[in-house]
Amino acid sequence: GAFIMPGTLWCGAGNAASDYSQLGTEKDTDMCCRDHDHC
């Protein structure tokens, strides 16, 4: 599978979130990555 940074669902290749509102434990980092993924 794709590598996702620990503590995040959106940082890395693809994402591990089941829906857009879901975030990992590193929320600030994850929100930044999520914004990049949904440009």
Curated annotation (Swiss-Prot):
Broad class of the protein's primary localization: secreted
Cofactor(s) it depends on: Ca(2+)
GO molecular function: phospholipase A2 activity
One annotated Gene Ontology cellular component of this protein: extracellular region
Similarity comment: Belongs to the phospholipase A2 family. Group III subfamily.
Signal sequence coordinates: none
PROSITE patterns for this protein: PA2_HIS (PS00118)
Broad enzyme group: hydrolase
Catalytic activity: a 1,2-diacyl-sn-glycero-3-phosphocholine + H2O = a 1-acyl-sn-glycero-3-phosphocholine + a fatty acid + H(+)
Protein name: Phospholipase A2
Highest taxon of source: Eukaryota
Annotated compartments: Secreted
Cofactor details (free text): Binds 1 Ca(2+) ion.
Alphabetically ordered keywords of this record: Calcium, Hydrolase, Lipid degradation, Lipid metabolism, Secreted
Phylogenetic classification of the source organism: Eukaryota, Metazoa, Chordata, Craniata, Vertebrata
EC numbers: 3.1.1.4
Residues forming the catalytic site: H36
Species assigned in the record: Heloderma horridum horridum
InterPro entries, A to Z: PLipase_A2_dom, PLipase_A2_dom_sf, PLipase_A2_His_AS
Functional description taken from the UniProt entry: PLA2 catalyzes the calcium-dependent hydrolysis of the 2-acyl groups in 3-sn-phosphoglycerides.
Single GO biological process annotation from the record: arachidonate secretion
SUPFAM superfamilies hit by this protein: Phospholipase A2, PLA2
Tissue: Expressed by the venom gland.
